[in-house]
Regions:
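Donor nucleotide-sugar binding loop of glycosyltransferases
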Residues: 50-53, 81, 110, 136
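Short, well-formed alpha-helical segments that are part of the catalytic scaffolds
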Residues: 50-65
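Cell-envelope/extracellular polymer assembly enzymes that use nucleotide-activated donors
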Residues: 40-42, 73
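Acceptor/aglycone-binding surface of glycosyltransferases and processive sugar-polymer synthases
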Residues: 100-106, 110-120, 125, 137-214, ...
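Acidic helix N-cap motif at the loop->helix transition within catalytic regions
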Residues: 52-56, 83-92
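Short beta-strand/loop segment that forms part of the nucleotide-sugar
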Residues: 70-81, 102-103
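A conserved acidic beta->alpha catalytic loop
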Residues: 78-87, 133-134
């Protein structure tokens, strides 16, 4: 039987989310049965102050998984939220054996949260999505099939029609054009939160700093060159407000690109 564990982070026990000098180790984990299991999909959700969306999002994912008879886990990584996100994540993980919850001591950033989720992911295919419900879980089956049937190393979503203000969409277009030219990878939406990977891809890369923007480039540098793209739905934000700024985000992204 599955047994729940709620513990203080112990590097000797798990070491799931750290590299040598990384100080962003989780404070708490709610995890079921840490013996590795064979499963189809791990859904990794980095989150920061998204308490309003979590029950609805996880229920939607569960419906999609059940309808398609997938074996799966949902890994929610709370990046130091100051709202009720952790309490909700903890409750959801006790109510559903498929949900695992991890909490950071403070806000370390999306890259750290993704890296932590990647290190814990057990599924043959790892799918990432944002917690704000602007990514649709209904995209999961098609992304899974592209990895498994067409043998892609990773698939990046492309939000071709967006519901963002121009202060965000214009810098995003400039960023993507620059990333395409620099890397030679012909993607339209490098930073789309909705992506799918073979498990071995996420286990072969280290996502740190602000490098979540460049995961396709990191994967390519690690030898995974079959990278595809799928047009995905971009849903209008239902709860809360965006956590990102337009011009600052673009400038930081360009500086990170120069460091790769």
């Amino acid at each position: 039987p599955l047994q729940k564990h709620s513990i203080k982070y112990s590097p000797d026990l798990f070491s799931p989310c750290s590299w040598q000098d990384y100080s962003g180790a989780p404070e708490k984990m709610n995890l079921f049965n840490r013996n590795f299991q064979i499963m189809d999909i791990s859904v990794v959700i980095p989150l920061y102050n998204e308490d309003e969306s979590l029950p609805e999002l996880t229920a939607w994912i569960e419906r999609v998984m059940a309808a398609n008879h997938f074996t799966y886990e949902i890994i929610m990584v709370d990046d130091g939220s100051s709202d009720n996100s952790w309490a909700l994540s903890e409750t959801l993980s006790t109510q559903n054996e498929h949900i695992r919850a991890i909490k950071f001591r403070r806000n370390y950033g999306k890259s750290a949260a993704l890296h932590c989720g990647f290190q814990n992911a057990q599924g043959d295919v790892v799918i990432t999505m944002d917690a704000d419900m602007q990514d649709s879980p209904d995209e999961i089956p098609a992304l899974y099939q592209m990895i498994m049937s067409e043998d892609y190393d990773m698939i990046s979503g492309w939000k071709k029609k967006r519901f963002d203000p121009k202060s965000k969409t214009i810098p995003t277009k400039l960023f993507n054009a620059t990333a395409r030219k620099f890397s030679g990878i012909h993607l339209h939406d490098f930073n789309c939160g909705l992506k799918a990977y073979k498990n071995k891809v996420v286990k072969s890369i280290e996502v740190y700093g602000e490098m979540h923007r460049y995961i396709p480039i990191l994967a390519q540098q690690a030898g995974f060159t079959k990278i595809g793209e799928k047009v995905v739905q971009h849903r209008a934000r239902k709860y809360g407000v965006t956590k990102f700024g337009g011009l600052n985000r673009f400038i930081n992204g360009m500086l990170d690109l120069l460091s790769i």
